[in-house]
Amino acid sequence: MRKRAIALRFGSSQEAAEFLSLVSERMGDRVIVEQSGSSVKLVIPPSSDDARGDYAKLLSLIRQWRLSRQSPRGGVFKHSITLLLSAVKLRVGIPLSAVAELLQLKGFRAKLEEGFLETNADFESAVRAAEEFSEKYAETLDLEAAPLVRRLAAVLAAAYGRPVDEVVEALRGTGLVREGEDGKLVLAVNYADALKKASSLLGSA
């Protein structure tokens, strides 16, 4: 197979460098990279063991980057979950659907769809929301509580800038959370209703 090259131009030299860092992380020395300011050249050498496969992976990375970083059609970015997780500094593993919930509470549109976080929040805002949720979720791990209670408390604490224990007490006080037979805190209503009611109460407090 002959050498394949792709030339790209980014909005800034910093954005170009960030993209090359991603390419290096994902593809290593299977891609030869050159940067000149905001311009980038990517080369798949013909000596590659799987040049066609590497070229396809590179095109996929470029597509994911563009969907996530460029001005969106209809006001919605499509952030690749893979790209998002590679950029986030997580305290603990998190359910990504909770990040969508947090963005919604912050006033953004957000949903998970086929490997993408579709939202009108830009990439940096999505990364920040994931990190905020992860930090609060880590604090809930000491609670004697069911997983959904921890998730709910972390989402609300991150959305409204409240301590986790304060949020838990508010949930208990409103009857949305109760103590189960085994002593663990459990939801008294379904998760969606609890999130809606609690966000209304905490948002107006």
Predicted regions mapped to residue ranges:
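A short, conserved structural fragment
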Residues: 29-31, 107-111, 172-182
